[in-house]
Amino acid sequence: MDYPLGGAYKAGWNLAQEFTNMYIGHGGEFFKPGSAEVSINNAKGVATLEMLKALSAYMNPDFLTHDSNATSAEWKAGNVAMMNMWGSRMGPLMDPEQSTPTVVKTTTLGDPMTVGGGSTPATTLWWDGWTVAKNISDAEAEATFIAMMNGINHKR
């Protein structure tokens, strides 16, 4: 197999998301402690860029054009053996009604990958959830949680 690794490295949002994933895996912090000052120009940021570059050596030379749709297509075509993909994209690949029998039979899921011998998953999922500030009282945190739960309740 010429290019065994697939990834959503399309220039722009996709590549930025992959940087974010890998940077978190390296234990990177986006801001200097106690401030809103961006802090990614550091050893962990460089290690992240070096890892992304190293992985690209195993990807299709057009990897900077591959978003999750193109990466899924590469998987379906049998052009890649491993990829880091969103869970929502894996369902169709494993569904006999949406994929081929060979793809369904040979597609499995694994634990989130780590990087550099660390134990922090090199992945993020920030768009389906919310956060509660840690510097508030338990009562305020509970009220925030209840308000958010009511906000997502489609029956209301």
Regions found by a protein language model. Give the residues of each.
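Paired acidic/hydrophobic, glycine-rich loop segments that form the ligand-binding mouth/hinge
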Residues: A81-W86, P92-L93
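Stable alpha-helical elements in mature extracytoplasmic
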Residues: L15-M22, G45-L52, T71, R89, ...
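Extracytoplasmic/periplasmic solute-binding protein
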Residues: M1-E37, K44, V80
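Short beta-strand and adjacent tight-turn residues that come in two discontinuous sequence segments
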Residues: G7, H66, N84-W86
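Glycine-centered hinge/linker elements that transmit conformational signals in sensory
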Residues: G34-T65, P112
